[in-house]
Curated annotation (Swiss-Prot):
This is Iron-sulfur cluster assembly factor IBA57 homolog, mitochondrial. InterPro entries: GCV_T_N, TrmE/GcvT_dom1, YgfZ/GcvT, YgfZ/GcvT_CS. GO terms for cellular component: mitochondrial matrix. The lineage of its organism: Eukaryota, Fungi, Dikarya, Basidiomycota, Agaricomycotina. It is found in: Mitochondrion matrix. Belongs to the GcvT family. CAF17/IBA57 subfamily. It comes from Cryptococcus neoformans var. neoformans serotype D (strain JEC21 / ATCC MYA-565) (Filobasidiella neoformans). Its main location: mitochondrion. GO terms for biological process: iron-sulfur cluster assembly. It holds the Pfam family GCV_T. Keywords: Mitochondrion, Transit peptide. GO terms for molecular function: transferase activity. Disulfide bonds: none annotated. The gene is CAF17.
């Protein structure tokens, strides 16, 4: 078992909402109930239901909240600019407090023996799947100092993503005594392997849809709460639409692989070939099987981010199902797979063609299992 790790998320900004109307104000704008499970994953949409920000909300009291988010200089709607126009006469103060707090993530702890949350699913139409968590007897204590703030990160089940933390600026987290100090690369690889998209590179502001961005299965959207900005399209899609694409984990497969090892063994090992710096997004192409009446390649999605040969991609689910999720193709070697005439997904990286394996990620796999057992 890998040692637990803790990493500073230096790219995250921190916003504070405070005042008598802070709770009401936040409830009208965020797509998750701000009091649910004492904080957690949420987001902010535009009026047409497109994602502008994913965020973590940390309630400090009924009248005070801290929010971590990513608003780089090229963001079309920074959170510090998005929220103030909605204040009107609300008694709420909006303040950037990034200079006061550092965002951290801690994962990999042995949490056996204590209280564990229970996940249930509420299913919509066309593949929409709302993840809902409950703690019997109250939310488990995070084990933090009094001056630290945190919440459980349940995007990829329990306890895979561990804790999201806010630590007073420049101070060492108390959990650093029981966790190895990691870095941003460790955090990025960890969440990518679990199929957890995050931030404007992967969830494109003003374009990405909540369900395609897996905010439903990661517990970031509440389809039954009161009105919030962007609710109409989101709820309508949940009840009557179809989710044909999702952001899922991918692994690049070298097509010149000569090993007799199975693709399954290849996927479970560390990448043997490192990639030079790669500019994303990258187009994914679907090549129909040799038995298909139509052999013309088609677009299957885009790779949004890469960490060496591991990444996240917005993929057409139908094509991932055809290529990877049915049959025994994972037992084949790469050469057997290519010779079989089976359908496949590929991409071009720096002029070289690679195979693209699409995984389901923790949350989508759990949702599919629930749908299968309920049918």
């Amino acid at each position: 078992m890998a040692a637990p790790r803790i990493a500073h998320l230096a790219h995250k900004s921190v916003l504070e909402l405070s005042g008598p109307d802070a709770q009401k104000f936040l409830k009208g704008l965020s797509c998750k109930d701000v009091e649910y499970l004492a904080g957690g994953y949420s987001g902010f949409l535009n009026a047409s239901g497109r994602v502008l920000h994913t965020a973590f909300v940390f309630p400090r009291s009924k009248n005070s909240y801290l929010i971590t988010h990513e608003s780089p200089e090229d963001h079309p709607a920074p959170l510090t600019s998005l929220l103030p126009p909605f204040k009107l006469r609300s008694k709420v103060r909006i303040k950037d407090v990034t200079s006061q707090w550092d965002a951290w993530s801690a994962w990999g702890s042995d949490l056996q023996g204590g209280p564990s949350p229970i996940r249930t699913w509420k299913m919509g139409s066309g593949g929409a799947s709302e993840s809902h968590w409950d703690w019997e007897g109250g939310v488990r204590d995070l084990g933090l100092r009094d001056d630290e703030v945190g919440c459980w990160d349940l995007r990829a089940g329990w306890p895979h993503m561990g804790r999201q933390l806010l630590i007073p600026k420049g101070e060492k987290p108390s959990l650093a005594t029981s966790h190895d100090l990691g870095n941003m690369d460790d955090y990025e690889l960890h969440r990518m392997l679990l199929g957890v998209p995050e931030g404007p590179t992967e969830i494109l502001p003003g374009h990405a849809l909540p369900l395609e961005s897996c905010m439903d299965i990661h517990g970031g959207v509440d389809f039954r709460k009161g009105c919030f900005l962007g609710q109409e399209l989101t709820v309508r899609t949940y009840h009557t639409g179809a989710t044909r694409k999702r952001i899922l984990p991918v692994r690049l497969i070298p097509l010149d692989q000569t090993s007799s090892s199975s693709i399954s063994d290849l996927l479970s090992s560390s990448p043997q070939q490192s990639l030079d710096e790669v500019s994303t997004p990258l187009d994914i192409t679907y090549h129909p099987p040799s038995s298909s009446a139509t052999r013309k390649p088609r677009s299957a999605g885009k790779i949004l981010s890469l960490h060496n040969a591991v990444g996240l991609a917005l993929v057409r689910l139908e094509m991932a199902e055809r290529c990877w999720w049915s049959g025994d193709i994972l037992r084949s070697s790469v050469s057997q797979w290519l010779d079989s005439g089976a359908g496949r997904l590929t991409t071009q990286v720096n002029g070289k063609e690679w195979g693209v394996y699409v995984g389901q990620g923790e949350a989508y796999a759990a949702a599919l299992e629930h749908m299968s057992s309920s049918s």
